[in-house]
Amino acid sequence: MNKKMGKIVAGTALIISVAFSSSIAQAAEEAKEKYLIGFKEQEVMSQFVDQIDGDEYSISSQAEDVEIDLLHEFDFIPVLSVELDPEDVDALELDPAIAYIEEDAEVTTMQTVPWGINRVQAPIAQSRGFTGTGVRVAVLDTGISNHADLRIRGGASFVPGEPNISDGNGHGTQVAGTIAALNNSIGVLGVAPNVDLYGVKVLGASGSGSISGIAQGLQWAANNGMHIANMSLGSSAGSATMEQAVNQATASGVLVVAASGNSGAGNVGFPARYANAMAVGATDQNNNRATFSQYGAGLDIVAPGVGVQSTVPGNGYASFNGTSMATPHVAGVAALVKQKNPSWSNVQIRNHLKNTATNLGNTTQFGSGLVNAEAATR
């Protein structure tokens, strides 16, 4: 609908039309704001529009000029979108045919900050300018699917029959979102939204993979200058090959962050149990150890892992439980620390995360405590 402008004169049975000079009209136009006028009936609204078209309208009030620019007439609800001077609203509200007048307020897409992101105090670190810029993070998982809330820089696949990094399972995309979901007013927010994110597919669409594939993924991370490798995967059995790969990646400068496991047992799973992997357990909203989270002497640190909302394939979002969900919180905070201290080694970053963690008590249950982005970026 074309924009229509009508002159309204508020006054008892007084119907006139006044011409403004161009300078006055321009000033009046600049003073106008957008409003929505709701009418009690559709028919009455149509009569109102006809009067605007004819530059005629009257209401019982003190005589004063009211000018309305009609922007849109809804045909399924009795509402008009208009522009008018805010000072004229009171006069229009005296019309008994008008049910309400409200500002045509701005509405934006809503971004949710998941509880875990707040719990590790990532938004405070981000407000200081630490968002992971310049830090390369590899997610060794089921791949990462394209998503409006993720910026993927590249990656590689080491799963036979699945040559690209697209995620046929969903797990890797969820992990990636906790690390790196963009600060873009949609969906969710990650711990380190500006990291350089890489998908390294070592698990197939079924959610499983081989030791050789995971070792190749670690080799890729080392050879391609990754600063951090997130491994939200594990096994109850150790592997000499896997341990060598973790050790070599660490020697190459990669901080390997791994999930402690989900059996609830009092020992840490593999590869998190290896000395050169940072073992991450899970906590709930009450800072208790999640019942499924494996624990023990080898546990380094904990992070939120219950009801973690993040990205999933298909531009969607969902909530999950697991130490797999806790681990990317730690990987993300590690990226913030690396940005703040670019010369620090992976060993320095690991120690710093442990030294700045929030003490939750029993070290067997919680390691050094809850990862704390605010304290880690002071």
Swiss-Prot record:
Binds 2 calcium ions per subunit. The active site is at D141, H171, S324. Its main location: secreted. GO terms for biological process: proteolysis. GO terms for cellular component: extracellular region. Ca(2+) 2 binds at A272, Y274, A277. Coiled coil: none annotated. Keywords: Calcium, Hydrolase, Metal-binding, Protease, Secreted, Serine protease, Signal, Zymogen. Ca(2+) 1 binds at Q111, D149, L182, N184, I186, V188. It is found in: Secreted. Residues 28-110 form a propeptide. Transmembrane segments: none annotated. Its EC number is 3.4.21.-. Gene3D superfamilies: Peptidase S8 propeptide/proteinase inhibitor I9, Peptidase S8/S53 domain. It is an enzyme of class 3 (hydrolase). Its cofactor is Ca(2+). Residues 1-27 form the signal peptide. It comes from the Bacteria. Residues 114-377 form the Peptidase S8 domain. Pfam families: Inhibitor_I9, Peptidase_S8. GO terms for molecular function: metal ion binding; serine-type endopeptidase activity. Digests elastin efficiently, has a substrate preference for Ala in P1 position. Belongs to the peptidase S8 family. This is Alkaline elastase YaB. It comes from Bacillus sp. (strain YaB).
